[in-house]
From Swiss-Prot:
Cell compartment(s), UniProt: Cytoplasm
One GO process term, biological-process aspect: AMP salvage
Catalysed reactions, semicolon-separated: AMP + ATP = 2 ADP
Gene: adk
Protein's recorded name: Adenylate kinase
Keyword Repeat: no
UniProt region (LID), positions on chain: 126-164
Length: 218
């Protein structure tokens, strides 16, 4: 099966990707891993990508698309693949369609893990850190045993990273929703989109994902 995974930050894509890869024995291809491998192997495209990344610039589409094509050309994707983090734009989605047709590895399905943005905001903005020892907690999922006291060192001073502050999280989600919506429409029009309710326990989400994948497989 040739698959793509979509979802907003905090939706649990990484966890579901691991479960899909374990159950269906297909390679997990994330954008970050692709770039790191291309740069480590010093391919022509990897060298080009590194030059942009080192300058703190976005890697242009032609380089990104080329790296994706190189990765999907590798033999381990002959049994299928799970794309994660690409495409990010409609232009990249068009390029991916051309690449996968050329390689005769077209997408069989796009799985969107749909979670209420309010729940995601709570998930992402609930993290706090002990200033003394750096132990990490979450107000909902991993609170301190005694309120206001670090389990590890007994410290009483905590802080939040800028990235985890509610306003930052809300802006990040807003940007991602604006970016994802056209892509979801793109794949829905091509009858490739399958949306799974991600507002459930991890195993329940995977059960729903598996049901979709078994349908695609058949």
């Amino acid at each position: 099966m040739n698959l793509m995974l979509m979802g907003l930050p905090g939706a649990g894509k990484g966890t579901q990707a691991e479960k899909i890869v374990d159950a269906y024995h297909i390679p997990h291809i994330s954008t970050g891993d692709m770039f790191r491998a291309a740069m480590a192997d010093q391919t022509d495209l990897g060298v080009k990508a590194k030059a942009f990344i080192d300058k703190g610039e976005l890697v242009p589409d032609d380089v990104t698309n080329g790296i994706v094509e190189e990765r999907l050309s590798q033999a381990d994707t002959n049994v299928g693949y799970l794309l994660d983090g690409f495409p990010r734009t409609l232009d990249q989605a068009d390029a991916l369609a051309v690449i996968t047709d050329k390689l005769n590895k077209p997408l069989d399905g796009v799985i969107n893990i749909d979670v209420d943005p309010e729940i995601l905001a709570d998930r992402l903005s609930g993290r706090f850190i002990c200033k003394t020892c750096g132990a990490t907690y979450h107000k909902l999922y991993h609170p301190t045993q005694v309120e206001g006291t670090c389990d590890r060192c007994g410290g009483h001073v905590f802080f939040q990273r800028e990235d985890d502050k509610p306003e930052t999280v809300k802006n990040r989600l807003k940007v991602n929703i604006e970016m994802n919506t056209p892509l979801l429409d793109f794949y829905e029009k091509r009858n490739l989109l399958y949306t799974v309710d991600g507002n459930q326990e991890i195993d329940d989400v995977f059960a729903a994902v598996k049901k979709v994948l078994d349908t695609i497989k058949d």
